Design a protein with these regions (language model features):
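Glycine-centered coil/turn sites that cap beta-strands in beta-rich domains
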Residues: 1-14, 65
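A structural detector for beta-sheet-dominated domains
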Residues: 3-5, 27, 78
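Glycine-centered tight-turn motifs at strand-turn-strand junctions
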Residues: 8, 22-50, 61-68
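Small/flexible residues
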Residues: 14, 24, 72-74
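Short, glycine-anchored, charge-dense loop/turn motifs used at functional sites
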Residues: 15-23, 55
Length: 78
């Protein structure tokens, strides 16, 4: 889940494997509210379920006034 100080941010977010290959796109230029949740369905771009392993969530939030926020989180899929 997330909480932003102000509205107006758009978000792009991806899932990468531990080798740095992009596995999935979570959102693409979606307008975010001040609070919310970004959820990934556990599927790769081709629609198949990903294997057990370590993955990286990476998001870029861009505000119309030029602010850019970047977030990265490592997680395990079992």
């Amino acid at each position: 889940s997330y909480h932003l100080d102000e509205s107006g941010y758009t978000c792009r977010a991806w899932i990468f494997d531990i080798s740095g290959r992009r596995i999935s796109e979570v959102v693409n230029h979606d307008l975010l509210g001040i609070e919310g949740e970004l959820a990934w369905n556990g599927l790769a771009v081709n629609g198949s379920k990903v294997r057990t392993g370590v993955y990286i969530f990476y998001a870029e939030l861009v505000h119309p006034q030029g602010k850019i926020e970047r977030y990265k989180e490592v997680f395990l899929v079992k």
